[in-house]
């Protein structure tokens, strides 16, 4: 009896108060009504049939009395646990049901025969026989027999009535409802499914067939309803009853009674605790899976030395994750719901008593946590079904319960593949999985707060053990208190020991002091100290790391103690808090988890059953790879308050490092990425997918080992033999044999592939790790001494800064993750699905320098010198041009360096400013000296160490050189031969070896070369592709637009043609130009076939090339990148015979002249073919054909926007605000261009000197930081007439250098959301796609056409139009813009922020919408309309010129659709010393978070914003002294130098690094955020200016600090 009674010990099902009070009476009434008014079973059949037949003797009173008499038997059997157990248990029902049915049948059979003997003519049926008997004694006997039938038969009857098989179907549809409500449906289904079938099945049994030969009354007898033999009916009835009894077992309603927290003492007064299983409803009795679950034998009572153990079903246990390990814990009752948002829902706080007898700490805890009602859940969903259902993780909210100690706690993330995601989330005994301590790490009293509380009852004369047994919950964590029985509480005490061990490890320095407290805690209630010693030794081993006992010893100790087996604390790492210095313990995943550690010490039968259950659960759990993919907790080094450098982590595998990568910064992007990752993981988390994915690395492994590597080795050594060198067979085979292949599953199991794969690799996922991977490398240094083919950039990828050759093997030394550079180190890699090597299983592919390229170069060099016909073929056909060092160079200059050698001051070793280097070139086999002027600051970029940076800069150099020498036309070379003076070449070789070998030197092959060049150009023109911005023929920009080709075949053909002919054509052009220059005499200028060149800014060309090339993905790490940019070439084109060129000799670059040089727009002579493709539309319309030879007159070669205004025939007058412009100009001259800010010009009506139509139309011209005194050319008569010139006043608020580059057709509509997205804000020509064909026609048409086009543009875009800022349309669109950009508007502040101050903060977009109006009129703060432009208080203009509004909006809202998605930088917890970055916006009761620094400058710039980076590269090319004046400087430069104070120069010099950092790295935040980190808008004349900062203007509110 004790065995099956122990199964009934279950926690109480928590119910609401109204259910507990009103549920049982209502349900009892329903049940009584069913039993009293409806036919409830076959015992009513005789009475009903007698009443219907109308026979005398049996009236309605008999039927009513029989129903009422049966209720006292039915009700106790349904509501009394004792009767219920006897009736429901299968063994009891099986033994009681057949005798009852047999006795019923036999008694009626005997009762029928007896009346037949006395009265032969009487009807021998049950009811009819009673009615036909006239004797008084016979009637009494019949009534007594009927009463006896009613009493006996209802005992087993209520089982099929209440819960038949149909009731199971109801539970599938009615989920998460109260078990009491489910009873009502079960009763209805039970009556219809159990009572009616039994009635009709029992009717033929109890009413046998009457023999017609018997004598009877004169009336005809009533035929029985069925014809069947009695022997066939009895077994059928018994089988039907047995089936219904076994199918229906559902919990019944019961009036719950709250149990006291104090254990109930037995009547004998002994120390053992009574089993209080009758206090709670025995829900475990209906566990339909209990047959497959093992039993746990746990100690009954609090005496650890007691040998009395009781059997508890496995139903009450589940696997949970604690702070340190997985352990068995009591599962929640079947009625509890799965925790979703807070683990407090799994604790029934409402059942805790709140009387004054409870200790004060308990009441305080109840008030803090709050009373939260638990949700009900379907009891069919238990713990063993959780892995199969795939529940999500529990989101524990620690900020509400105070466990998250303001950034000092570290989340302990455990990746253990032993259990699934759903089981991990079902934590019952813990409110949080985080380890949290107080701020101070000093000694604290580790005692329970309830032990010494004033209200804790302590009886005198009792020892400590009795006190602990009397009040067991005083030693359990308060967060784990629930209305469990005392036995449950005893099992939960195991968690306290585990948590205490975690605290011991955190504070090693106080271990000896805490150990005494542990011993005192473990010695509670026991005089035997064997368990204390065991626990103390285990804690000591866990804390000191010395617990290395075997599992057998641990099992013996656990069996002796009767506890849950404890896991040794290992595989931990430590993290140190930077602020407090506290030590944190982090649990790392156990590679090979042992299922036995979760077993209760007991019989081997339990272990065997546990193994079977574990294996069955493992087949339904998620794979370890899935658990890794869905893990989204940030690593501890990214937690608040934790210093990443202070984390002491041991060696980790590559797979573990992959899990600790940083997560996205913005919350929205992080959630989206997590959702996609989890969806993909769930979609591919099945055995077939893992098997397929695992087979691919295995196939790649064998293919690599047996096919690929041997083939490459053989081919490599054959190449060595062809080069007449010794092969390296032995070395290659030895290294190949050193490769070791290790198969690893994602749960940590590893095995060598040669010996077998890991267990269950097809389920857990497989990855192949290659130890000592073999790769082809050069063991000789003959290849590295040679220079690479000339690419026209002067870049030497193998040289160092000291001029020495560098071996490529330095790149290959650390090709793999952990390879050692000291030699002999063990490298490793991971094979991917496609057979490539990666640094980690899910990491990036390992990239190494090319092995075959230098080998083929060496092969060509060797055969070049040995076979004569190879040389001839190479001259004419080979694409590459290998050449050796010049044996007798006349002069050398340091080439473009790409090495990593060290140099003093991190400068490039080269010639000093003003020096010229001499180079030699071989033409036709001879040596000709050609002196080339060479500027190291422009021609030599800084050295880089990364190959990707090297290639990126090489692409930039190629584009710059291409612009310098034209598209497919000949480069212009003006030179003098050696001994005759110096010559200037457009692009000279700068490396040590730039000789050109071969070539006959005659004019005969030139014609053939021209044919080849033309054919190549025609082929490339047929393969044009459209890029994002303009259509570019790939005759020149092959490397720029190849990454963005639309079709792979086109891309392949273009690369094939360009690579095969690029070197060849380049060599032919150089040779032709040199030959032409030699025969022309002294200082002969060579005309170009294309004379329609345009002078453009180098800043614009470089930024344009940067944007169109692969460099858009490259961000230079060094701000001094561009000090020697190869694109910064000096113009050398000549327009006539003789002279020095358009710009003449460029002055020496002094230390202070870099800003003038950066702003100088004349840098390149670009042919119109290229100019039509890269120039903006507005610029192309205003440029003129450069016919001026004089440098001073050349300044007036372009028609600007100002001149276009003057062309309308109105002489401008002096403008107002000149003094203000002078001050700004002085400030601009004393600071770098990147620090300057735009100024807004007042209304044009107040400016004197503008055209009258502009005044009438109230047109406002955007301001642009003009230079001092400029001369303008006006229309009328001729361009050179003095009367058509006018001298403007100094510092007018408009100029020519900027507007000529900013002109654009701006959309007429005020609809920001539909405007094109800007790639670079101030390059406004990119706002609309350019029409190359139309633009090229403008340029080629000449000056008159360009002038007419300007006037046409002004007519089309009338400036007289005005926008009414108070209109409803503007208001609606501005509100739409605000909603689209105001990310903080959607953030809701919870109620957990204490003491919020009332106030409002203007949002980002509201400030921007107000800033679009002219600043002189927006002094008034926004009104209650939340900053909308729908009111006029007299301080803001209701109308504004649309041209100015367009310009202003483009200045304030650059590409806002992409930049205002993640402005919010919310820091929830901060110290008082650090001001908060967030504020509270409260408008009409709504609270939102708005950052104080929410302006455009804080938003990271897009990747393609390369213009500012390029312009900043020009700044540091000069020295630090800005006072020095360059040769040929202007008078304005003298004045500006004299006016600027030296203090400003020093300040600008000190802040130069921060300024450049803010541009190169937008996330950089210097000390002064008001001046730094602002968006720079670069202009094409080399200058920059920042947009007006969008600040937050408080509107009658106070910021929260």
Curated annotation (Swiss-Prot):
Belongs to the TIC214 family. Pfam families: Ycf1. Residues 548-558 have a biased composition (Acidic residues). The chain crosses the membrane at residues 25-45, 68-88, 147-167, 181-201. It is a multi-pass membrane protein. This is Protein TIC 214. It comes from Selaginella uncinata. It comes from the Eukaryota.
